[in-house]
Amino acid sequence: LFEENGGAL
């Protein structure tokens, strides 16, 4: 999944 800041989890 991708957070709002664009960081991939």
Curated annotation (Swiss-Prot):
Induction: In response to ultrasound associated with a high frequency electromagnetic field. Keywords: GTPase activation. Signal peptide: none annotated. GO terms for molecular function: GTPase activator activity. May keep Rho-GTPase in a GDP-bound form. May bind to Rho-GTPase. This is Rho-GTPase-activating protein. It comes from Rattus norvegicus.
